[in-house]
Each structure stands twice: as structure tokens, then as C-alpha cells.
Amino acid sequence: MNDAYVKSPLNYIGGKYRILSQIIPLFPKDINCFVDMFAGGANVGINASAKKHILNDNLIYLIDLYRKLQITPLKKVLKHIQQRIEEYDLSLTNQDGYVKLRKHYNERKDSLDLFVLIAYSFNHQIRFNNNHEFNNPFGKEKSCFNASIESNLKSFINKLQIMNIELLSQNFEELDLSELSDNDFVYCDPPYLITTGTYNDGKRGFTGWAEREERLLLNKLDGLNDKGVKFALSNVLNHKGKTNKFLEKWILDNSDYVINPINTNYSNSNYQTKNRDKFATLEVLVTNYIPQTQATLQLPLIPTERDYNEIYWQQRKLT
């Protein structure tokens, strides 16, 4: 990965860090206000170039953590982390200490304690139950606060504190974008309708993601397009033999929208050969403008499933 990009200290499964070099060059140049509607680990938002950034996520405890990191001196953050590690004797094997800290966090909701918990939790996942209690299990022999996380945290805090960033914790339906103009830009990486996983189920003790939410988001993006506001949507068209029919129809109904295939390497596949694995994950970045770096990628009609591989991807070869 290009060292020019800062990696989030939150190891979000499904995060975009490893494909930043593919998607960020597709963004418009000279953005006034960059809006990340589903910020998650903030890998995209923290690395996108703009005069102002708005990072939004409906997980209020995640945004509370970012706010804490935004206003707290780095030395104080690191001191708090070290104190908690020593106080609860946290390690790769001490599950009892982890459980005690988790109980403490659920009683107090200290944002920095949440960060420590995430560092030692299973797969570094962020999960809350319906009572808004953090309930991710211990990451035995795999998860801890290590040198890599510390390095990422330092770089992340530095950018978070020097950039012009507004942090919001709203459901995407309630996010007011009425003041945006043609110099602003909205990026969306929502939960994916046709995939499953704790990183994108949209729940974690909060609102889930189903067909209703998918339609509302696509309608919201159409509204931005009507106002002349540029947007980019990360999503999955195909996954393990499934097709996101809502997304496919939406693209067909909006012939000016552009599909930019993203190589995620989720499976052994090559999108530009007619023998592409039909069970491969096909991730795309849909834009309502032609990216400067791929100006020849006008959106063709999406063919039927029968000739999807043979025709469509041959037409979409990158130049």
C-alpha cells in the first residue's frame, strides 16, 4: 500500500485501506466539502483531499471515539491506553482482564476504553447488543495493542487534529445535505445488501440494512445528482452467485452513471476475462461523473446474466 495513505487504527473488516489507491484517484479534484456518509474506520475520509470533511456514522460510540481522539493530546491518549493495559493486565491470553474492562466500559462508556477493548477483541470488531453494550468476545492469542496499531493511531490522530473535520452520528436518512453545491462531494460505503458479515450487517445494536434502506440511499443519491452534487458509491454488484438487482436496475435507469470496477481480490478472479468466476465478488465504485483518470469508461447497458461475463467485462476493459 502507498505510504502516502494513513491507515485507520481500527481494523475494520471490509475497510477500504487496501484499495485506496484505486478509489481516491477516481474522486473529483478540488473538493470543497467531502462528506463520508458511512465513515466506519474512516480510511477513506481521513485520506481524501478537501477543504472540509464531514465524517458521519450512525454508530454513536464510534463517533464519540473520534471526537475524543480529535481533542485529546497524543501523549494523553497513549498514557490512558498503557494504564488500562497495566490495570487489567491485558494480554493475548488474559480473557478475564478483557471481560472486566468490557464490563467497566459498558458502565462508564469512556471512549478511550472502547479503543483498548477493540484492540484486544475478536477480529478487532465493533459490536454492540440491543442494550448498546459492547459485546464482542476476547480475541484470544490474536488481538492486542501492538506496535502496528500504535503507529497507525499516532498518524491517524495527527491528521484528525490538523484537518478541518466535522464529526456527525446520524442515520443516513436524517443527514441533511441540502446545503451542498456542485463543488462538494459525497462518498458512500454502506452495508452491502447481498453480503453478510458483522462488518456490514448494519446492526451492531443499531439500525439494520435491508431493501428499504437500499432504496432510500439510492433515491438520496439521485437527489444529489439532480442538484449537480457529485457522488461516489462503493457497493457490490455480484457476490457468491448473487446479484444486487436493486443496484443493477438503478444503474440501468441512470445511463449517465459510471461503473468503475474495483479489484478487491476477495477471490481468485479477473474481471476483464470472459471466464471470470461467477461466484467472485464484484465490487464497484458508481459515480455520477466521468472520473478524470478513466474518462473513457462510459456506462454501457448491463447485459443478461448469460452474457454478463462474455460481453460486459470485455466492453469495460481499462485503458
Segments predicted by a language model, with ranges:
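SAM-dependent nucleic-acid methyltransferase catalytic core
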Residues: 2-19, 25, 29, 74-187, ...
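Short alpha-helix immediately C-terminal to the canonical SAM-binding loop
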Residues: 63
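Conserved SAM-binding loop
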Residues: 66
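Class I S-adenosyl-L-methionine
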Residues: 1-54, 58, 175-180, 184, ...
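Glycine-rich tight-turn/loop motif centered on a GG-T
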Residues: 204-206
